[in-house]
Amino acid sequence: MSRAIAADKREDDSQFDSTLRPKSLDDYIGQEKIKGNLRLFIEAARGRGEALDHVLLYGPPGLGKTTLANIVACEMGVNLKSTSGPVIERPGDLAAILTNLEPHDVLFIDEIHRLSHVVEEILYPAMEDFQLDIIIGQGPSARSIKLDLPRFTLVGATTRAGLLSSPLRDRFGVISRMDFYTHDELATIITRSSRILGMEIEPRGADELSRRSRGTPRIANRLLRRVRDFAQVRADGVITRQVVKETLALLEIDEMGFDHMDRMILLTIIDKFSGGPVGLDTIAAAISEESDTIEDVYEPYMIQNGFLNRTPRGRVATLAAYEHFGRSVPAAPQAALL
């Protein structure tokens, strides 16, 4: 069973997300610094009649990178072509996409960190010189020809900016980090989504749902779907604070937005390893989960909210984690926790 609070994309999210997705920077809620910068750069590019400089958006999943790519295309008044790193397996795949772009079009590559090295080599001159180097023939008779490309904007999105090669990262003129959303921003997003879907939600209901959505709009909108179902069947269609609490209790999501797996990770560190430090591989073995999954999917939210520390010696549960679960802090590590 998939996690209701997983921030990764799912097939059943696509139609729902497209309905709720804002179409302009004015409608986009949150990420104020990024919005302000993009608004300035877009206005300048349009004023000069040029393509926008290449944009790299990085940060945890579900924060709106794809939405911003769509908005960039809309604000520039151009087409958007979308693909992802794993899909572009060969240089020919990328060449086919690039040669079909119109002037000033936006090419969006999700999971850009997963591009192969050989595909990246094709992308470098395309981004920098708007030229495509193609090898014709094989062996001694092989020759290279250059094809001119229309000036386009590449918008790359990644959850793991550290895996991008330096040559690729250096070719982006605009690099922006997406941050988790505040409770107030999420409550506004939830209220907006409810209005679009024709649902009645009370302010306290939106606030309660925002506090359990892990700072992530995708999770907030997904949980809103589940709350809508509950409200429709058991609460006359009105989403109140109590409806939200009862729905999320059924989904085993607590007041911090932790689900069963989050609690298992933290309680394993606290109960089995005296709060840590404990190695990531040891935690993974103890709960039968992949180390990469723990590090990339579960830990960021815990660290962001001060429930977990990464140290050179391993993971350490913080004082906040002990208090959240009503556990007594061991005497020895207490100073480190404080």
Curated annotation (Swiss-Prot):
Q: What is its main location?
A: cytoplasm
List, in alphabetical order, the Gene Ontology terms for molecular function in this entry: ATP binding; ATP hydrolysis activity; four-way junction DNA binding; four-way junction helicase activity
Cellular component terms (Gene Ontology): cytoplasm; Holliday junction resolvase complex
Start and end residues of each stretch annotated as Large ATPase domain (RuvB-L):
1-181
A single GO BP: DNA repair
Report the Gene3D superfamilies cross-referenced here. 1.10.8.60, P-loop containing nucleotide triphosphate hydrolases, Winged helix-like DNA-binding domain superfamily/Winged helix DNA-binding domain
Q: Which residues take part in binding ATP? A: L20, R21, G62, K65, T66, T67, E128, D129, F130, R171, Y181, R218
Catalysed transformations (reactions): ATP + H2O = ADP + phosphate + H(+)
What's the EC number here?
3.6.4.-
| Record NCBIfam families | PRK00080.1, ruvB
Q: What job does the chain carry out?
A: The RuvA-RuvB-RuvC complex processes Holliday junction (HJ) DNA during genetic recombination and DNA repair, while the RuvA-RuvB complex plays an important role in the rescue of blocked DNA replication forks via replication fork reversal (RFR). RuvA specifically binds to HJ cruciform DNA, conferring on it an open structure. The RuvB hexamer acts as an ATP-dependent pump, pulling dsDNA into and through the RuvAB complex. RuvB forms 2 homohexamers on either side of HJ DNA bound by 1 or 2 RuvA tetramers; 4 subunits per hexamer contact DNA at a time.
Give the multimer and partner information: Homohexamer. Forms an RuvA(8)-RuvB(12)-Holliday junction (HJ) complex. HJ DNA is sandwiched between 2 RuvA tetramers; dsDNA enters through RuvA and exits via RuvB. An RuvB hexamer assembles on each DNA strand where it exits the tetramer. Each RuvB hexamer is contacted by two RuvA subunits (via domain III) on 2 adjacent RuvB subunits; this complex drives branch migration. In the full resolvosome a probable DNA-RuvA(4)-RuvB(12)-RuvC(2) complex forms which resolves the HJ.
Record-linked PANTHER family: HOLLIDAY JUNCTION BRANCH MIGRATION COMPLEX SUBUNIT RUVB, PTHR42848
Q: Protein name, please?
A: Holliday junction branch migration complex subunit RuvB
The protein's organism comes out as Pelobacter propionicus (strain DSM 2379 / NBRC 103807 / OttBd1)
Source taxonomy = Bacteria, Pseudomonadati, Thermodesulfobacteriota, Desulfuromonadia, Desulfuromonadales
Gene transcribed to yield this protein: ruvB
